[in-house]
């Protein structure tokens, strides 16, 4: 008789036969049902942070409260724009943008690379390349690449309105309009439904873009995006997902849900730097000149009469200068803080008579260590290498001290590469819509065959890039000469190609195919063999080229 077990099933089922037969079909069905009950979507993807979430069903949602959220974005963006006017920030932004994209004559700032795209014909690849050129022309990117990337970097967001002719969709995108980044914000419309157990499940999530250009005056600079007599719109506009291409900085959202810009870490260091610079200027001006000290003999005058006498004398000899921190000028405005005032001191009868003396100035006016400290903190917040701050220094492209700056420059290089990849989302979206509208491909092929493998290459400075590549190649060839005697005994040729020359799998296959192709074309010379079957100057190294030999014909002529 089979016994009862007290195992796993015994604990929860009150005991059961150990050898009882389990219905695997019913068990699997119950597990599937449990998975389905847990598969209800009850939360949004965390990747949707930084957007406004509205709840509604059908057309019941409204945009109450979105306007105030948009005003918060406007305030943040305007603060970034005001920061960009500071010389230190302007210099840092210029360094970063010039490293992200280089605008040289007769060169396109960005090109599309389809080398890794497989599964499509060469004709489709040519069409993709042509569509990408059309997108670059619509953006006028060849002429405005620096300005567009700089504006995206400063504002921390950028949006384009994609305009298509509804009567001729095959014509593709007709125009790309850059919208004011202060006036637009993504909004997710979430529709929920009540499920069993009282759980609110998310039925659908729709992306919209809320645009309100009515409040476009910059509260920091006072500038308005439009004329005072013209308002672009007196109503709130809501765009569909396919009408707008919107890219933010990609940073983690703040506590208020706003995605900060790339200048956000520099707010505090910049304020400290500006305050320190102003204090340094004020100290230098106040302590540099010798101030006058008036000692007035008031005799036996009463307190009130003495004060009136001093006030009258101060009016005659008043010397008051003020420093305007907004312009850096020295003015005589009375409402500003005085920085070089005279001293007026009364004297009673029996002491010395009226006297005018001087108070010595400061002797430590050249101390700038505190200013340089905050300037370095500012550039550290913006990921700028310290080597970029020395204007009088030369650019180190290679050499003995290359390793000393490699770590900092490598970090900056990766940072700029991340900015390029982030901004490339614009090209990806514009190209996708252009290809689908023109019928070059469909959504499925784009997502499966093109999008995962397409790359956008930004043009860098040609001279510096060439020198860097030459320096790297020379170092690798020097290492190759070092390990060459050990190839075949310790290292294989494949190891040398991949670990010494740092060639990728694609590069190894490509070079081997090119060598075989060039041999077939006869680009490598053939040499005359000697009596032993070898040729003069032969080398036993497996890494060096061995030309094909012609059979020995008894002649010492080495001509081919």
UniProtKB/Swiss-Prot annotation:
BP GO terms, sorted: symbiont genome ejection through host cell envelope, contractile tail mechanism; viral genome packaging; viral release from host cell
The reply to whether Zinc figures as a keyword in the UniProt entry is no
User: InterPro entries per the record?
Assistant: Portal_Gp20
Q: Where is this region: Disordered?
A: 526-560
Which keywords has UniProt assigned to this entry?
Capsid protein, Late protein, Viral capsid assembly, Viral contractile tail ejection system, Viral genome ejection through host cell envelope, Viral genome packaging, Viral penetration into host cytoplasm, Viral release from host cell, Virion, Virus entry into host cell
Major location category of this protein: virion
Cellular component terms (Gene Ontology)? viral capsid
Annotated compartments:
Virion
HAMAP family (UniProt xref): PORTAL_T4
**Protein function:** Forms the portal vertex of the capsid. This portal plays critical roles in head assembly, genome packaging, neck/tail attachment, and genome ejection. The portal protein multimerizes as a single ring-shaped homododecamer arranged around a central channel. Binds to the terminase subunits to form the packaging machine.
Q: How does it assemble?
A: Homododecamer. Interacts with the large terminase subunit. Interacts with the major capsid protein. Interacts with the capsid vertex protein.
Output this protein's name: Portal protein
Q: State the organism of origin.
A: Salmonella phage ViI
